[in-house]
């Protein structure tokens, strides 16, 4: 078994810490857990790096208003568009410019009302740049500018280049990009800033006169900028024009990452297929048809700012109702039911009468390396993105398909290594049917070719199997049979992964191939098991995400206790039977039984009746009266000793009396003989 690294670290057993914690420590722990569970949403670090999300690049002015943005659905840190904010939109509401009364909303209009020339002449001199009338905007387009960064500077550079009062360009050599002739083409900054259009002065004047704002910038990300992960907090620059007075503006670039956009509410054909909650996992519901995204249409009322921005791809999402999440009992029972369907398709004889048990502590899943065929796709809907990543598999076995730079400690899991074609358009690498990618960054249903780094990361295609233990029917009956006391042997358990491998082929390594290409019953069982696995992984990931910012040891303890509480509720509710630290469900050919404790009681009663029929009349005394056995074993010794004394006592006493009388008679005879011998001697004299 191999531990596949991930962001969620598994720690050793921490039960000894519980006995060392005082009541005050428990109070602090409860407060900490309340803060963790009641905190905000999941951070970006908890997300699957291959999962597409809504990325919004924003350009903010000095006033903090968003003057330009663009959106797309892509994996994080893979989409680097060209940003095109207008200079006059950045200068709106600034007292240092000639449009202090123009807010951001008016700057986004098709043709904002120009200030009257009388007021404009008071603010700027003839021949100066500005935003209040067409000629001033046109002169701006032909001017040179330079850009200085605020972030990423050392203390000495910050003192030398100044702050907002100088737009971070207090001295020369602080600028990093721009249109100046003295600037190098290769920028050492995170971005490069140029003019978006290079038209002649006359054409520029006509364009500025017709469309209002006409000075969009062209901001591109450098290779250094694409490696930075600090765009979420935003980075700020100062832009100054190489003209008299060096006027300028400040702008901030920020990335906003959110989940997939919510679907609209309305009539849809998929609603017809929805019914009451399913009572069986025999077949999954049919997938709704996917619709191609409609082409984006230009808006006749769009501004020059809007037309210069990149139009994001619009995707039509299938409407679904917000169904409540499954309860703990339904989720765990569906997991057992899916395991039964898969096991019944591979080894029907094993499911005639048995118990399938869920363990309280991790690991909850084990993986078998798979060698199924993979496919490339640009359709992100083909991936099961509902399940987050960042989960670690502690037990991976078998031989399967690997990609990336596999370390020496994991090469025995690979019988084939695949190279990813990362060039070209962005694509997703889909695993074979019912498979996952177990990567060094965590568990993921799909791989993004733009995110995956072949020189650093590695992934193994695996078949996920829940850690479910198999016991024959007699094991639970013996564990709960208190009417027949005897020394019980330790129960021998088999995991579901071992049973699937033994039921299909002779080994787990080759058995994984049969899991991919099996009969129709097996495919249906695997589909049902996959649905249950997805629901359970989502619940586990939610627990990990809420606790990720806390101590790793605390996360593991709470996560283990959380599954233990789930199983405890099932056991106390009579839905499963407890065997050591496992929650067991009764299985027969009809499937998993929800009321397993009731089924166990029926089995025990039936076994008791059969045993009573085969017993003699005196054997029933010991079964009907347990105290009689204890009383008899207590007084049996003294009774046997008393009986022996009564039987053998008279004989022993008689023998002893006879022996004493014999000895007394012998003594008397000796005394008489001595007297008679003396008289005889006297007569002879």
From Swiss-Prot:
SUPFAM superfamilies: ENV polyprotein, receptor-binding domain, Virus ectodomain. Residues 276-309 are annotated as: Disordered. Specific enzymatic cleavages in vivo yield mature proteins. Envelope glycoproteins are synthesized as an inactive precursor that is N-glycosylated and processed likely by host cell furin or by a furin-like protease in the Golgi to yield the mature SU and TM proteins. The cleavage site between SU and TM requires the minimal sequence [KR]-X-[KR]-R. The R-peptide is released from the C-terminus of the cytoplasmic tail of the TM protein upon particle formation as a result of proteolytic cleavage by the viral protease. Cleavage of this peptide is required for TM to become fusogenic. The CXXC motif is highly conserved across a broad range of retroviral envelope proteins. It is thought to participate in the formation of a labile disulfide bond possibly with the CX6CC motif present in the transmembrane protein. Isomerization of the intersubunit disulfide bond to an SU intrachain disulfide bond is thought to occur upon receptor recognition in order to allow membrane fusion. GO terms for cellular component: host cell plasma membrane; membrane; viral envelope; virion membrane. A motif (CXXC) lies at residues 354-357. Keywords: Cleavage on pair of basic residues, Coiled coil, Disulfide bond, Fusion of virus membrane with host cell membrane, Fusion of virus membrane with host membrane, Glycoprotein, Host cell membrane, Host membrane, Host-virus interaction, Lipoprotein, Membrane, Palmitate, Signal, Transmembrane, Transmembrane helix, Viral attachment to host cell, Viral envelope protein, Viral penetration into host cytoplasm, Virion, Virus entry into host cell. Residues 42-632 are extracellular. Residues 1-41 form the signal peptide. A lipid is attached at residue 651 (S-palmitoyl cysteine). Disulfide bonds join 148-169, 161-174, 354-357, 354-584, 576-583. Residues 654-685 are cytoplasmic. InterPro entries: FMuLV_rcpt-bd, TLV/ENV_coat_polyprotein. Residues 299-309 have a biased composition (Polar residues). Glycans are attached at residues 301, 344, 415, 421, 433, 453. The 17 amino acids long immunosuppressive region is present in many retroviral envelope proteins. Synthetic peptides derived from this relatively conserved sequence inhibit immune function in vitro and in vivo. The YXXL motif is involved in determining the exact site of viral release at the surface of infected mononuclear cells and promotes endocytosis. This is Envelope glycoprotein.
């Amino acid at each position: 078994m191999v531990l596949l690294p991930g962001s969620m670290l598994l720690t050793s057993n921490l039960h000894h810490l519980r006995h060392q914690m005082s009541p005050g420590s428990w109070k602090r722990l409860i407060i900490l857990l309340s803060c963790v569970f009641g905190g905000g949403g999941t951070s970006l670090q908890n997300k699957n790096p291959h999962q597409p999300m809504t990325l919004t690049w924003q350009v903010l002015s000095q006033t903090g208003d968003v003057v330009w943005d663009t959106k797309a659905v892509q994996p994080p840190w893979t989409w680097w568009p060209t940003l095109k904010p207008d200079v006059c939109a950045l200068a709106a509401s600034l007292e240092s410019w000639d449009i202090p009364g123009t807010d951001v909303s008016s700057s986004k209009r098709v043709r904002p009302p120009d200030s009257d020339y009388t007021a404009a002449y008071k603010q700027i001199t003839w021949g100066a740049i500005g935003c209040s009338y067409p000629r001033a905007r046109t002169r701006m387009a032909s001017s040179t500018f330079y850009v200085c960064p605020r972030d990423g500077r050392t203390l000495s550079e910050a003192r030398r280049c100044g702050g907002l009062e100088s737009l971070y360009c207090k001295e020369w050599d602080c600028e990093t990009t721009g249109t100046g002739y003295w600037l190098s083409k290769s920028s050492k900054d995170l971005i490069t800033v140029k003019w978006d259009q290079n038209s002649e002065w006359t054409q520029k004047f006509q364009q500025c006169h017709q469309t209002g704002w006409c000075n969009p910038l062209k901001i591109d990300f450098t290779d250094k900028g694409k490696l930075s992960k600090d765009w979420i907090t935003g980075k700020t620059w100062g832009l100054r024009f190489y003209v008299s007075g060096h006027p300028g503006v400040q702008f901030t670039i920020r990335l906003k990452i959110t989940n997939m956009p919510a679907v609209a509410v309305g009539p849809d054909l998929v609603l017809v297929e929805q019914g009451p909650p399913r009572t069986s996992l025999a077949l999954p519901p049919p997938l709704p048809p996917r619709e191609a995204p409609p082409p984006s249409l230009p808006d006749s009322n769009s501004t020059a700012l809007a037309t210069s921005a990149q139009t994001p791809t619009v995707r039509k999402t299938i409407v679904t109702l917000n169904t409540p999440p499954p309860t703990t009992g339904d989720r765990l029972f569906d997991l057992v039911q899916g395991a039964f369907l898969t096991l019944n398709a591979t080894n029907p004889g094993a499911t005639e009468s048995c118990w399938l048990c869920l363990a309280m502590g991790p690991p909850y899943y084990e993986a078998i390396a798979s060698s199924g065929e993979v496919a490339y796709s640009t359709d992100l809907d083909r991936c099961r993105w509902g399940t987050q990543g960042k989960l670690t598999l502690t037990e991976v076995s078998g031989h399967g398909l690997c990609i990336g730079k596999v370390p020496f400690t994991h090469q025995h899991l690979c019988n084939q290594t695949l190279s990813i074609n990362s060039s070209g358009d962005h694509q997703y690498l889909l695993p074979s049917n019912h498979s996952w990618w177990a990567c060094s960054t965590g568990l993921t249903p799909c791989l993004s070719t733009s995110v995956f780094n072949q020189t650093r990361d590695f992934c193994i295609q695996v078949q996920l199997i829940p850690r479910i233990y198999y016991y024959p029917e007699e094991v639970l009956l013996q564990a709960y049979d208190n009417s027949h006391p005897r020394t019980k042997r330790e129960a021998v358990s088999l995991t579901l992964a071992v049973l699937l491998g033994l039921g299909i082929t002779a080994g787990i390594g080759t058995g994984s191939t049969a899991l991919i290409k099996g009969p129709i019953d097996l495919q249906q069982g695997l589909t049902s098991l996959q649905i249950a696995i997805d629901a359970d992984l989502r619940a586990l990931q939610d627990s990990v995400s809420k606790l990720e910012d806390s101590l790793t040891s605390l996360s593991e303890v709470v996560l283990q206790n959380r599954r233990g509480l789930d199983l405890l509720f099932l056991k106390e509710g009579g839905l499963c039977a407890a065997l050591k630290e496992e929650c067991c469900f009764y299985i027969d050919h009809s499937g998993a039984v929800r009321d397993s404790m009731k089924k166990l009681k029926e089995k025990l009663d039936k076994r008791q009746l059969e045993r009573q029929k085969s017993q003699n009349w005196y054997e029933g005394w010991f079964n009907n009266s347990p105290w009689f056995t204890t009383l008899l074993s207590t007084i049996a010794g003294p009774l046997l000793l008393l009986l022996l004394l009564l039987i053998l006592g008279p004989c022993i006493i008689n023998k002893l009396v006879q022996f004493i009388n014999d000895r007394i008679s012998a003594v008397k005879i000796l005394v008489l003989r001595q007297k008679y011998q003396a008289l005889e001697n006297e007569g002879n004299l």
